Amino acid sequence: MFKMFKTKQTKELYAPVTGTTISLEQVPDQVFAQKMMGDGIAFELESNVICAPCDGKIAMVANTLHAVGINADNGAEILIHIGLDTVNLGGKGFTQLVQVGDKVTKGTPMIEVDMDFMKEQNIVLTTPMVITNSADFNFDVEDGEKHVIMGEDKVITFK
């Protein structure tokens, strides 16, 4: 009877992009490789859309549009950083599809990437997704390199 009062809790994070998974340790940026921002996973980006990996609320969109933060329904704070050194582009090559405060569900498009522009600028599109408050959670991260589909494949499971 009381199940109707339970709130839905995020149990998994799904791939926010289509691409190949890599461990954070393989990211050629020490801030992510040494997990200074939190634990998680990274992707070699193939798709031009970054989508929500779970249900939650948009907490932050960087002024330069290279990063987006989500507060998941279970309290996890998720940061998706699109590419490396993309902050230097000043927002060029990105289209914002969500606003701070928007409620999102798994698969909601958040940022669109101009892949041709990124190639012209020689931008590395390795895209880390970290749980910035990862010390507060127990979770398993998919290991090994594997091809994932945006919004379909689980990459992190909370215990």
Annotate the PLM regions.
Residues 1-159:
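Contiguous, well-folded functional domains in the mature portion of proteins
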